[in-house]
Amino acid sequence: MKILHISNFGDKHNGRLYWNQCYKISNGFIRNGHNVYNFSERDKSRSDLLNKFNNNKKLQSSILESVKIYHPDVVLLGHADRIHHETLEQIRSINPNIKIAEWNVDNYMLDNTEHKLKTRSKFLDGIFSTTADNKLSECLSGNFITFFPNIVDPTIEKQKIYNNT
């Protein structure tokens, strides 16, 4: 399966965020035999100064161009807050069979998470969240929402602190 993983990969930080969930998720897909293209939407947004003034127009076209070139089976979003809902609709018009899902590791009550999930839900096939709360089901819009645990990747978490307890 080909997966276009759109998230904040933090390229501007020169490896400082190597432990982020987005890398662990991509690593897991690759280890399970999938082809993953990591698209760092915040870095791409910042790379064109005009994006700041034109509502990320260049970012939206770059995402659509990536979908046309890469032909993913799945678009997976993770904290990809700069993607417009219209862009998600256009992705479906390019490939009506594509699956679009979002993962979330933020507390439901913090950082506008509830609003983000509720407004984006109708454009998604599903949502994966590390926080389980009955309020999360209010985000459903004809799709599914499910719990997934915080991810541990043995290639990243090497300290094994749990052995010290």
Model regions and ranges:
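Nucleotide-sugar donor-binding and catalytic loop/hinge architecture
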Residues: M1, K158-T165
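Extended catalytic core of nucleotide-activated donor transferases of GT-like folds
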Residues: H5, F9, G15-S141, P154-K158
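Short, flexible helix-coil linker/hinge segments at the edges of structured domains or between repeats
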Residues: I145-I161
